[in-house]
Structures are given as structure tokens and as C-alpha cells.
Amino acid sequence: MGSIKKTKGKSQSTKRVVTPEVFADQQARNQLANAPNLTEKSERRKANKLQVKKEQARARLYGKKKKESTYSEKDLDLPSLNKAVNPGVKLRRGKKGKKFIDDHDSLTLHRLIKTIGDKYDDITESKLEKDRRLEVIRELKRQEIERKEAAKQSQLEEKKDELKKKSSIARSMRRKNRRDQERDLHTTSNDKVQRKKKSVSFA
């Protein structure tokens, strides 16, 4: 607590001056006087002139340093607050949409039935059973791949046939046009010959 000091003068005033205990107490005042005037060191050291020149030269040669990229919550894809996150459920990113299969596509249906519960169901089976099941799945996948390859090949053959037909039609059209041109040239030359023949009339 500070000590209250009354001011004395010719006319006593009712003013009171409150002085801190540090200055009132002699021991405290001496300790304060002996303490060095320390200022807090700044976290960043001031750059040296030589260092600054070096950095400037480096910037001229190689360009400025890239600033450290700061990411927002949206970039980091953090879950928003007050939102329940279901454990084990991962939202799929990227391509959205469903892959539809034909109703009578038994191969794909069998493969899906065999593989759909592998990740989530705790199947207790022996190694031999597991190997058999995986072999069946592999066989189904192989058949699917073969079918896709056959479909691609048939599509390619159809395209080839179509191109062949187009080229043959174009070839026949070119031949026909050439024949027509030759016929036209022949008829025009015949007309010119007939015109050149002199006709003699007797009176």
C-alpha cells in the first residue's frame, strides 16, 4: 500500500499525495536504482548489411524465395465443428456417378456377389477355402476381361468393315465420274468433227 503524505505550507490544504511504496522505502529505492535498464530482446535479429547485400544479389540471380504457403481450413479439408463424424465411413472423392451393368450380365453379378463382403465381413475360413474363393473370383475377372477384349475386337472389325465399304463406294463413284467425263469428252469431240465437215448443196 502507498503511504499518504500531507502537504505542509503556509495555509494547510486538504490535498493528499499518494506516493508508491517503492519510492517511500529506502531499501526498495536502492534496489530499483541498481537494476540495469534492460529491454526485451526482439525475437528476430536485425539483418547485417553484408547479409542483406548477399540476399539481394541472390534474389537478382535466382529470383525471390517463395513464401511459405498458408492453407485455410477449406484447403486442408478439416471437418467442420458441431458435425458428427461417423467412424470408419470415408466419403469418396473424385469421380461421382454409378456404373450400371446389364440385367443379364451374370459374370459381373457373380463377381460382385463374391467380392462385396470381403472387406467388411469377418469371414472365418481356412486357407484352402480362401484360396478356392479367391481362385473363383480371379476366374470370373479373367472371363470379364476376355469378354471386354472380344467386344473391343468386334467393334474394331465393324469399324474396319465400315471404312472398307466407304472406301469401295468412294472408289466406285470416282470410276463412274471418270467414265462420265470420258463420255462427255468423246461426245464433244464428235460434235466438233461433224461441224468441221463441209456440206455441199447442189442447186
Swiss-Prot record:
Amino acid composition bias (Polar residues), ranges on this chain: 27-39
Comp. bias intervals (Basic residues): 166-178, 194-203
Coiled coil regions in record: 129-176
Subcellular location: Nucleus, Nucleolus
Region (Disordered): 1-82, 147-203
Skewed-composition ranges (Basic and acidic residues): 68-77, 147-165
Keywords: Coiled coil, mRNA transport, Nucleus, Ribosome biogenesis, Transport
Spans traversing the lipid bilayer: none
Gene Ontology terms, MF aspect: identical protein binding; mRNA binding; ribosome binding; RNA folding chaperone; RNA strand annealing activity
BP-aspect Gene Ontology terms: endonucleolytic cleavage in 5'-ETS of tricistronic rRNA transcript (SSU-rRNA, 5.8S rRNA, LSU-rRNA); endonucleolytic cleavage in ITS1 to separate SSU-rRNA from 5.8S rRNA and LSU-rRNA from tricistronic rRNA transcript (SSU-rRNA, 5.8S rRNA, LSU-rRNA); endonucleolytic cleavage to generate mature 5'-end of SSU-rRNA from (SSU-rRNA, 5.8S rRNA, LSU-rRNA); intracellular mRNA localization; mRNA transport; negative regulation of translation; ribosomal large subunit biogenesis; ribosomal large subunit export from nucleus
Family listed: Belongs to the LOC1 family.
The protein's role, per its UniProt record: Required for efficient assembly and nuclear export of the 60S ribosomal subunit.
Protein name (database record): 60S ribosomal subunit assembly/export protein LOC1
Species for this entry: Candida glabrata (strain ATCC 2001 / BCRC 20586 / JCM 3761 / NBRC 0622 / NRRL Y-65 / CBS 138)
Gene expressing this chain: LOC1
